[in-house]
Curated annotation (Swiss-Prot):
Principal location: cytoplasm
InterPro entries membership: Beta-tubulin_BS, Beta_tubulin, Tub_FtsZ_C, Tubulin, Tubulin/FtsZ-like_C, Tubulin/FtsZ_2-layer-sand-dom, Tubulin/FtsZ_GTPase_sf, Tubulin_C
GO terms, biological process: microtubule-based process
Upper taxonomic lineage: Eukaryota, Metazoa, Ecdysozoa, Arthropoda, Hexapoda
Keyword Cytoplasm carried by entry: yes
Region (Disordered): 427-447
Protein family (similarity comment): Belongs to the tubulin family.
Name of the protein described by the UniProt record: Tubulin beta-1 chain
Length: 447
């Protein structure tokens, strides 16, 4: 069986991760003690992707929980599914990273990283055929961003041919915990560009807007935001957890989604977005789902896909529905909005259908888009970064942990390069390539 090792780092990562395990345990019929009470063989057919089987027929999440302070881990442990995790897989420090990337990456985190890698190694060794790793973390804090990226690069060293997948919560000015978020995020993106195969960008700003506008919640809590994130994660991983044809493992997903190695930052979306109480009042049709799923209001990253073009798209439909209708609707969307899809990747939209809907819904759809509009998100962080870095504000917190200003400059230019790469492919057309090749040939002849 193709296993995935799940790692959650920092406060945000652990809270989202805990929600994720609650939701998928529920979908697979596993209760808070790890016992199976399901009603369908499909629930167990690929259970090994995320769970180890322990003695007595219990299922234990293949999860490693990491933090530099004990607080969040304690609340996960005392939460509804706290007893399902393997106690040895909680690895935490006492000092905290104080929202400082340098502490997470170079000092405090570096001290803890070996004990985390021991646990990861133990999980990886007990796998039959490991397909890769997934990390949930935020980019705005210290542990998830600094230590999370440190773990990624260490795991990359040890398992260079395994897929590395992250669910990264990107900071936003509207929902800010700390003033140094732009620094932490830029330093993290610098790492993610080089060391991950797939990164789902989840954006607090977009989540807030969804809670506010669509779900009509007047004061959204982090609990509400995390609920949305876990819906999305459950949807994105459907193909991995239930038998199906398309994108059935992390590598196939990467092959379909990533046209150029650096451009692997995806915009997730979900439909239908209904507030927690009102699901049962109406059933959606496939056309409505498709329409909603491509709508900018349903994106979990605060970028408007209409400001860019899609390089690739994967869509996952869940529930009992007609495959034919799904294909028709997806083609329909592409034909109507053909200008929003690059024409130099034909058939760049892939669709999967899974029979098992999420709890409380008859059918749902999850959207994964690799759109050039994601550059808006990086631009936003970059502007805030530059504003502070120009004055060297707050820099002493980082240099005090042994960092060099050069590293900031490098991270900044790497992120700006990423933005220009997205821009370049947004403007590229199928005809330009021919001209470009002619130019190159001419240059070769001159030389």
């Amino acid at each position: 069986m193709r296993e995935i090792v799940h790692i959650q780092a920092g406060q945000c990562g652990n809270q989202i991760g805990a929600k994720f395990w609650e939701i998928i345990s529920d979908e697979h019929g596993i209760d808070a003690t790890g016992a199976y009470h399901g009603d369908s063989d499909l629930q167990l057919e690929r259970i090994n992707v995320y769970y180890n089987e322990a003695s007595g027929g219990k299922y234990v999440p293949r999860a490693v929980l990491v933090d530099l302070e004990p607080g969040t881990m304690d609340s996960v442990r005392s939460g509804p599914f706290g007893q399902i995790f393997r106690p040895d897989n909680f690895v935490f420090g006492q000092s905290g990273a104080g929202n400082n990337w340098a502490k997470g990456h170079y000092t405090e985190g570096a001290e803890l990283v070996d004990s985390v890698l021991d646990v990861v190694r133990k999980e990886a060794e007990s796998c039959d055929c490991l397909q890769g790793f997934q990390l949930t973390h935020s980019l705005g804090g210290g542990t998830g961003s600094g230590m999370g990226t440190l773990l990624i690069s260490k795991i990359r060293e040890e398992y260079p041919d395994r897929i590395m997948n992250t669910y990264s919560v990107v900071p936003s000015p509207k929902v800010s915990d700390t003033v140094v978020e732009p620094y932490n995020a830029t330093l993290s993106v610098h790492q993610l560009v080089e060391n991950t195969d797939e990164t789902y960008c989840i954006d607090n700003e977009a989540l807030y807007d969804i809670c506010f506008r669509t779900l009509k919640l007047t004061t959204p809590t982090y609990g509400d935001l995390n609920h949305l994130v876990s819906l999305t994660m459950s949807g994105v991983t459907t193909c991995l957890r239930f038998p199906g044809q398309l994108n059935a493992d992390l590598r196939k997903l990467a092959v379909n989604m990533v046209p150029f190695p650096r451009l692997h930052f995806f915009m997730p979306g979900f439909a239908p977005l209904t507030s927690r109480g009102s699901q049962q009042y109406r059933a959606l049709t496939v056309p409505e789902l498709t329409q909603q799923m491509f709508d900018a209001k349903n994106m979990m990253a605060a970028c408007d896909p209409r400001h860019g073009r899609y390089l690739t798209v994967a869509a996952i439909f869940r529930g009992r529905m007609s495959m034919k209708e799904v294909d028709e609707q997806m083609l329909n969307i592409q034909n109507k909005n053909s200008s929003y899809f690059v024409e130099w990747i034909p058939n760049n939209v892939k669709t999967a259908v899974c029979d098992i809907p999420p709890r409380g819904l008859k059918m749902s759809a999850t959207f994964i888009g690799n759109s050039t509009a994601i550059q808006e998100l990086f631009k936003r962080i970059s502007e805030q970064f530059t504003a502070m870095f120009r004055r060297k504000a707050f820099l002493h917190w980082y240099t005090g942990e042994g960092m060099d200003e050069m590293e900031f400059t490098e991270a900044e230019s790497n992120m700006n390069d990423l933005v220009s790469e997205y821009q370049q492919y947004q403007e590229a057309t199928a005809d330009e390539d021919a001209e470009f090749e002619e130019e190159q040939e001419a240059e070769v002849e001159e030389n």
